[in-house]
Amino acid sequence: MELADIVVAVPLDAFSSTDYNRADEIIKAGYDAAANKAAILSTLAVDTATWQQYLANREARQRSAPIPKFVAVTGTGPRLARNIEHDMADVKGNPVDAAKMQKRILYLQGLGRFNNLSYQMTERNGQPGLLILAEERQYAPPIVRPLLLVDGSDFLNPTFNLGARITFLDVGDFRSEWRNDVIVGSQYGITSEYYHPFHPDSNWFVSPQAYANNSNFPLYNQNTLVANYRQEIVGGGGDIGYIFGRTAELRFGYQVGNESFRRRIANAELPKVSGRFGFTRLQFQLDTQNSNTIATSGNALIFRTDYFDANPGAPHGFPLSEVASFNNFPLNHLTSAYLNAFGGTTYGYNAGIPPFSLGGTVRLAAWGTNALLTNQYFLFQTGVLRQLAQLPPFLGGGLFFNARFEVGKAYGIPYLPTVQGDVVGAFEVNTIFGPVMVGGAVGNAGHQKFFFRIGRLF
């Protein structure tokens, strides 16, 4: 340093090695330090004409990139290499567009099996080509995503679950996935789904599924827990579908199985219900949100319409439709607003076991889980999400405060007011264990509660 002719000293004493979220402050400190040396640095400046001449000379020395005649892949097995080469076939014979190429590289890396992907120009037999450099993960596939879920929607009776999602890639062909979810604790279950495109480049896919699940099913009378059932479901089905880019998909299929509700803590006079279920379904999903846990921008839409030919307790078949819309509006870099809407109906038909449930921590949080079981409902949510702090990346993400107002109606429940509503305040944070939420809610008709939640289902 003592040999330098000019020293621009940036005061960094106020920063530590974990202040990743203060990058803008550090950059500003550097600019301010340079501005303090403006008088000395200006002596090294050149005029506009000289600078333009330098740019012209530099551009004249640049060579145009050769047009690739082939695509090659290294760093992975021959089968996967052939599929990547096929996916990149349109690059041959055209100039390489760096921006588009980077998007394609990011897409391939997002499939989950590569630790790193890059590209460079190469030459073979005197012909220019594009070389994809792949570095596969040593520990995957399969990809194992652990689950920790503590649900304190009734904080006096929290539930605890452990589990994992195990995903096998390229089973059968490139882009095929075999996804398996396992959960144990207050809930026991296993779900297996196989996603298989018609061919590696196709947007059309088939998806058979099988599942078995045993979980708590509490019943409330207003704020009072009156019974606790175990809900047991064993079933399966299959879909044919179409994906629209990376943000939307449409599915059509059929599900069939058996569902039963067995009393654990309940009056012996309360019924036990069981029977076959079967339904044809059409489902559309769109998701452009910037996060699947705490979203601050983007939108999501889920719509389904089903026809049940059988359902426990239902005297005959019935149609069902449900929609959920999530809309996030950034106000500044720390604050966003949102407006969500939900609705569902069986069009006046008796569905047996009511298919829609409000209450818990997500929809009408002042009510208990399954406090509002209904054949028809609507619900609106609006609120503000404010980031209070930023955790270091190795611990998680941002700490937010969520202020929410909810209003809706569950039809066909006699003791309820005309509409149900509440105000909710909760602290939310993304952590290495998943999202954590702690808050409280106050609603009409005397409903109020404290709640917490750690983690989320897959």
Model-predicted regions and their roles:
Residues 1, 390, 413, 422-427:
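Short glycine-rich, acidic/polar surface loops and turns
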Residues 1-15, 25-31:
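Conserved catalytic block of serine-dependent lipid acyl chemistry
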Residues 3-5, 68, 375-379, 396-402, ...:
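Active-site lining segments that contact anionic ligands and/or coordinate catalytic metals
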Residues 116-283, 289-291, 356-362, 371-374, ...:
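Gram-negative/organellar outer-membrane beta-barrel architecture
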